[in-house]
Amino acid sequence: MELDAPPQNFRSPAWGWTKATRALTFLVLVFALYLIVGETPATHGAVYDDDGFDAIDDFRGAVLDGGSGKAALTVYECTLDARGCAPGSVRSKQLSRAKADAVAAIRAADLSQLVTTPTPPLSIGLTGGVRAAMARGDLARPDVDRFFASIKRPTRTLKVLSGADEARLERRGGGYCAHAALGVHSDRVGTMGSGGATMQLAAPGDGDVASLSTDLLGIEDRAAATGDEAALREWRDDIDAQLRTVDVHGFEGAELVFAMSMHASAAALAGVDGRRVMRKVADIALQGLVGAASAPGPAWDAVGAPNPYHLDPELLRRATLFNAARTRSVVEALPEGTNFYFARQVGDVSCDWSLGLFLEDAAAAAADRSS
């Protein structure tokens, strides 16, 4: 599924889902919430083939994000220095993004269900949706091993990411993007990221990381049974209880918290993405979005969430509600005085854990080159 670019006068992403079964429909919706369309100059090749880099110094790779109901394939390039990617040299381009069943692809040992195009050397991170399937017993470690062993193209890192892995990689990618956007040193950047099954927090530097279970599909099912108001209370109570187990003191020294993925989607609809905002400003804006999405009517209509695929308005509204409430819970849990920057992309670089994995691969390549 490819999403159309939003109108020029609309800053939020075009996002959508298709109707099939109820559960599959929501997985597609989760994937759509996960996306923000980023424009990449059409004159470039797989990443950039006309940027003037000396070819011997170029490092290229692709990263597959296999998570909750989606597969996103991004290709990256940078210039290597002695430590990895040289500051400011990373470029990225999303090659594909689609509704996909990563669990089925793994069981079938069939990468083509997730990746349909040639790539530079490929790294794969399997995230919350796959972790949940393994925890339920729907997928076993030997299934994953067979899937990885079946891949015929050149590869680098192939891994089921733990929640802590995902949080650390988000911190690495978010630190790079925060420096690119605002000049903030990466060691002073905390991060918050989210998907369909989990959300992650990482304090700056070598601070604590945490991954929390936030099942959007499950809460949508309960909302259909109990109504939005009761489900929203349950959702907030569960998230707040998990957040109380996180030591947020490590964020007190953060110059900035870089908020990515579905948190950035919520901020885009609330009008606080792409700029530095104080905690109170973000909280008020997200509170307004939660209120607007709490019921059909003029307030919700005024949000103007794009719907190019003519989706069921009620489920679109409900998904927005729970995603915004989740983001607001995290914002409220972090220390007063925290500065946030919500974004999926800085310039032409996608900012998420996939970037962090590419940066790690580049650092390993630089170390190999110097040894």
Regions found by a protein language model. Give the residues of each.
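Short, low-complexity, Lys/Arg-enriched N-terminal segments of secretory-pathway carbohydrate enzymes
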Residues: 1-20
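Hydrophobic membrane-insertion alpha-helices, especially the h-region
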Residues: 22-37
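Ser/Thr/Pro/Gly-rich low-complexity linker/stalk segments immediately outside membranes or between
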Residues: 39-57
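N-terminal module-boundary/linker segments of secreted carbohydrate-active enzymes
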Residues: 52-68
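Helical "lid/coupling" subdomains associated with nucleotide-phosphate turnover
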Residues: 61, 75, 100-118, 129-191, ...
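Short loop/turn segments at strand-loop or loop-helix junctions that form parts
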Residues: 66-67, 93-100, 122-129, 260-261
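Conserved Rossmann-like nucleotide-cofactor binding loop
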Residues: 69, 197
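Short loop/turn segments immediately following beta-strands, especially the blade-tip
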Residues: 78-85, 206
